[in-house]
């Protein structure tokens, strides 16, 4: 049996005490993520102020929240009479003064632009009570830099929900350079109170946990396609039908949006260099042509008639262990750099992306020596940094920590 305590949605009495102090929440930005996050907090009993720059944006957001709540009622996840009660907990406004008044927590959900986010944080810092925690739902940008726009960097952190927030169980809690342990503990307890599973990102690194591991897998798949070693359909069929993943990598990229995948890829390349070397030949022509995936009806696949059919017959034409190897390698870097624990990484990948296993537990089951040798072989063949084994994996192999078969790997058995 694995000797570890998984992050869970059950809060301890100490955590509950921290969460109890949080009553009023401001959500800044009523777009897809913002209105979903506002709904999540309102469903958990919090009073919510939802802010955007135009009343029409707010009206649209409230209509979407009502639609979503009605769906919850249809599926008997809430009582029909609760719909109006939940909606009544959300007040909309275009005024920062109104939104920030007497709040205990703010969640910023504006577009991924650092200058814009810093302006939001500066305003919140000026107007919100000194006790209030200020958080960002960013998926790529620096929490530390946002905190620099405030006089309370100890109370600033990342609170990264996954899309759609009403349905996805995971939240990444990101610690900036000056974020206090109490702030992190409070946010962890709040996540549990709203029915989410939090994982702690101990350092303010680009991509946090989930997008970093996912980014490594995308890079490997894009280069494999570019080298002509497998078609996108063959890669996706193998990943889905042999690997048990919910989507193939190209299908997933289309679902996320190729503009977002390309933009995030550049952020990762800037942060980590050759380990995230982008493959512009694969993605740039599509982005330039406006083929951004599902949202535009075309990307790697044609989405005009719904989700593309990935032929089962093509499974087996791509070695899925290549995907696993680079995922394990990036997970090892996260552990090596003390960004996250193996348990939180595994929880993140399973709950944030629907993976059949976390990379650390997969490596322990497969054999860390097997993964290490796979990476070393690929690195010797291609001389590309994303195959270069992390020093942690080399260290584990030298120590004989090979996973389940030796009772010690990422976990102790």
What are these regions (language model features)?
Residues 2-413:
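N-terminal glycine-rich phosphate-binding loop for ADP-containing cofactors
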């Amino acid at each position: 049996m694995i000797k570890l305590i998984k992050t869970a949605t059950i809060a301890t009495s100490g955590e509950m005490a921290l969460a109890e102090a949080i009553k009023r929440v401001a959500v800044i930005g009523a777009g897809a993520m913002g209105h979903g996050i506002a709904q999540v907090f309102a469903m958990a009993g919090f009073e919510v102020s939802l802010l955007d720059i135009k009343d029409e944006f707010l009206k649209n957001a409230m209509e979407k929240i009502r639609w979503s709540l009605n769906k919850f009622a249809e599926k008997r996840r809430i009582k029909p009479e609760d719909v109006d009660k939940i909606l009544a907990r959300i007040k909309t406004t275009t005024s920062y003064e109104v939104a920030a008044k007497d709040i205990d927590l703010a969640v910023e959900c504006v577009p991924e632009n650092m200058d814009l986010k810093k302006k939001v944080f500066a305003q919140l810092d000026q107007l919100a009570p000194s006790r209030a925690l200020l958080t960002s739902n960013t998926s790529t940008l620096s929490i530390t830099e946002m905190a620099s726009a405030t006089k309370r960097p100890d109370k600033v952190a990342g609170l990264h929900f996954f899309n759609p927030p009403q349905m996805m169980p995971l939240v990444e809690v990101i610690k900036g350079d000056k974020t206090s342990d109490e702030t992190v503990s409070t946010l962890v307890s709040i996540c549990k109170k709203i029915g989410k599973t939090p994982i702690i990102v101990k350092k303010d690194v680009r991509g946090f946990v989930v997008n970093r591991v996912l980014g490594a897998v995308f890079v490997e798949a894009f280069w494999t396609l570019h080298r002509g070693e497998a078609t996108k359909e063959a890669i996706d069929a193998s990943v889905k039908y042999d690997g048990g993943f919910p989507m193939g990598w190209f299908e997933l990229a289309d679902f996320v949006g190729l503009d977002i995948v390309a933009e995030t890829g550049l952020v990762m390349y800037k942060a980590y260099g050759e380990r995230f070397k982008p493959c512009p030949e694969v993605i740039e022509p599509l982005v330039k042509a406006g083929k951004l995936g599902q949202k535009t009806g075309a990307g790697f696949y044609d989405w005009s008639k719904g989700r593309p059919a990935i032929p089962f017959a093509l499974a087996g034409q791509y070695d899925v262990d290549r995907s696993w190897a680079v995922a394990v390698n990036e997970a090892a870097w996260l552990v090596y750099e003390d960004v996250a624990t193996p348990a939180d990484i595994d929880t993140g990948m399973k709950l944030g992306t629907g993976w059949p296993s976390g990379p650390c537990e997969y490596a322990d089951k497969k054999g860390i020596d097997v993964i290490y040798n796979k990476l070393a072989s690929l690195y010797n063949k291609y001389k590309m940094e994303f195959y270069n084994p992390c020093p942690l994996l080399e260290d584990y192999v030298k120590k004989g920590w090979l996973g389940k078969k030796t009772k010690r790997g990422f976990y102790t058995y």
